[in-house]
């Protein structure tokens, strides 16, 4: 009887059901109790043809909002280098700078799968370094999985981590940590380079990665790779055929300054609203309007 109950609940909980399509209402907590999203749920969604969204996040409060919104996968990306710490690239950020961010996100998102980025310099030297870095994120921060950049060149690291029981999300195409080698922010996998991108995708899948991010890859190539792989693909500037999509949340919500990349769609003007609220608050304080009687004891 208990097995039947468990099986039935698995079919109806948040983690086992596909994400709710845009424009439709999420099931109520009473009708569909939520549980933790696991890597096997992403595999199930790929097999069933259900697409899903991933967002970056770097703090407790934002993680809580996205978890409440039903975002199934949250990435504490090394993009924190840019949007949290103000570095020009992702290269300078360290494990010690990322771990406190991951801790906050894990606490704020009880249902999402939380993935932590391994920063530049923490895994390139080989499997032992990768295992040491990933272990810190799992033990000290409570991450559920880690992400690392590279294809064939990091296959041994991926195999080592998965053998140790650490789920790995791979990242191919444009890899921001290699921006200096790649000559800037350039689309990868065009022309003859397509074969290497395909080889990278196959290599990370065979090494044991549970999914792979493809960044700034031609849509046609991303479609081909998604069809070849049994693991989910996650696109960022890789067209609509990927199994999932990811954006930096500040780009998605309109908090980032400057021109957005071509692959970004802005769904809000959070930056404008924050500025408006801050200006109004300052004016109310200066004019003696705030605090008013209702704000006093």
From Swiss-Prot:
Gene from which this protein is expressed: panB
EC class: transferase
Compartments in which it is found: Cytoplasm
Quaternary assembly: Homodecamer; pentamer of dimers.
E.C. numbers: 2.1.2.11
Cofactor note: Binds 1 Mg(2+) ion per subunit.
GO biological process, one term: pantothenate biosynthetic process
Main location: cytoplasm
Pathway, per record: Cofactor biosynthesis; (R)-pantothenate biosynthesis; (R)-pantoate from 3-methyl-2-oxobutanoate: step 1/2
Pfam families xref list: Pantoate_transf
Binding positions for Mg(2+) per the UniProt entry: 78, 117, 149
Physiological role: Catalyzes the reversible reaction in which hydroxymethyl group from 5,10-methylenetetrahydrofolate is transferred onto alpha-ketoisovalerate to form ketopantoate.
This protein's record includes keyword Membrane: no
Protein name, as recorded: 3-methyl-2-oxobutanoate hydroxymethyltransferase
Residues holding 3-methyl-2-oxobutanoate: 78-79, 117, 147
Family: Belongs to the PanB family.
Record key words, sorted: Cytoplasm, Magnesium, Metal-binding, Pantothenate biosynthesis, Transferase
Any one GO molecular-function label of the UniProt entry: magnesium ion binding
